Amino acid sequence: MIPWVLLACALPCAADPLLGAFARRDFRKGSPQLVCSLPGPQGPPGPPGAPGPSGMMGRMGFPGKDGQDGHDGDRGDSGEEGPPGRTGNRGKPGPKGKAGAIGRAGPRGPKGVNGTPGKHGTPGKKGPKGKKGEPGLPGPCSCGSGHTKSAFSVAVTKSYPRERLPIKFDKILMNEGGHYNASSGKFVCGVPGIYYFTYDITLANKHLAIGLVHNGQYRIRTFDANTGNHDVASGSTILALKQGDEVWLQIFYSEQNGLFYDPYWTDSLFTGFLIYADQDDPNEV
C-alpha cells in the first residue's frame, strides 16, 4: 500500500518539471527537471488579482425594518383663510364680575322748584366770631421816621428759573431797610403794615405761569401764553403783613417757566414797598 502512495506523490512531482520545461522549451543539460520532493511550506499570499466583471443583479431582498423618524420639516406657508364656521351654541352665564370703579360725576342738573317752607327749628348755638371790620380812618402821618422805611426793587440775571421754588432776583436796584434777601429771593417783613407789591416779567420761547406767594399761599397768579414773540406778564396787589411774614414770586406750573433775561435790552422786575405801618408797631415813633 505504501509504494502506491509514494508513486502517487512522485508522479506529479516528476511530471510538473517536464511539462514546465516543455512549455518553455527549456531542456538545458543538467537541469534538475526530475527532482521530486515533498511539498514545501506555504508561500506568502500573492498580490490581489484584477477585479472581475460585475455579476448579475441579485434578487430583490425582503423589506427592511422601519427607520427612525426624521427631523421635523420647515414650517409650510400659511394656507388661505377658510370660510367662517357656524355660530356655536350660547355658553352658560359666567360668574358675576367685580364692582367697577365709580364713574365721573355727571353734569349739574337744573335748579329744582322751591319747596314749601319748613317748620321753625330750635335756636342754634352761638356762632363764631365775625370777620374783622373795615379799616378805620387813617391816623396821623409819621412820614420821615427812619423806622418805617421799607422798599425794594430787584431784577433777575438768569432765564427759565426752577419751578415751585422762590425766584432769586439777585440784581438789587433798591433795598431800603434791607428787608429783601437776595440769596433766598424772599422779602421778609420788618415793619408790620400795608404793602404794595408788583412785578413785570419778560417771557420768551415758553408760556409763563407765575404767582405771588405770601407765607406759602398764592395770593395772585398770572398766566401768559407764548405767541412766538417776546411778551410781558404783570401783576400787583396790596397785602397786610406782620413781622416776619415772607413774600416771593415762583413758577406754579410745570414747563411754564418762560421767564427770559437779556442783559442788553430787557429786565424782569419784582418791586414792593410799605404804604403805611401799623399804629401799634413798636418801631413806630
From Swiss-Prot:
What keywords would UniProt list here?
A: Collagen, Secreted, Signal
Q: In which tissues is it expressed?
A: Expressed in adipose tissue.
Q: Which GO terms describe its biological process?
A: regulation of lipid metabolic process
The record, for SUPFAM superfamilies, names: TNF-like
Q: Where is the composition biased (Pro residues)?
A: 41-51
- Kindly indicate where the leader peptide sits in this chain: 1-15
SMART domains to which the protein is assigned, alphabetical? C1Q
The residue ranges flagged as biased composition, category Basic and acidic residues, are 66-78
Q: Where is this region: Disordered?
A: 33-144
Name where it mostly resides: secreted
Q: Which InterPro entries match?
A: C1q_dom, Collagen, Collagen/C1q_domain, Tumour_necrosis_fac-like_dom
Pfam families in alphabetical order: C1q (PF00386), Collagen (PF01391)
| Ranges of Low complexity composition bias in the record | 53-65, 84-120
The listed locations are: Secreted
Collagen-like domain: which residues?
40-141
What is the role of the protein in this entry?
Answer: Involved in the regulation of lipid metabolism in adipose tissue and liver.
How is the quaternary structure described?
May interact with ERFE.
- What name does this protein carry? Complement C1q tumor necrosis factor-related protein 2
This chain is encoded by the gene named C1QTNF2
